């Protein structure tokens, strides 16, 4: 396991980080990432698989799998909804109207800051989802008058 337990304890005691990434290498000779994704899909309606690869490589260097998020964030027409799921499965939800969802997203991300550690990929966790085309209306007011025909949320993370 990387980092060691003592290193994790030291990072946690520094008070600088809301999360500390932990890595364990697993040989993928029994299940492919797609097979693991199918298993996770049965356990949670929210799951994802991200594969990394350099442009000249066929195979990915890392497979990122995630499920059962502790936070869900959506925004439609300025109405931002944040759903928290704690470790004891207690759920809370808050709603607010905003003209600038980016501010709220940055505020949330500060709480989950993690250290950059040697030997780890650039992405060690965080928000996963999408910003739709309609999200541009928050940066460009003239686009607010146009209503998209699709039923996508402006943000779904």
Roles of regions detected by a PLM:
Residues 1-157:
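Signature of the chorismate-utilizing enzyme
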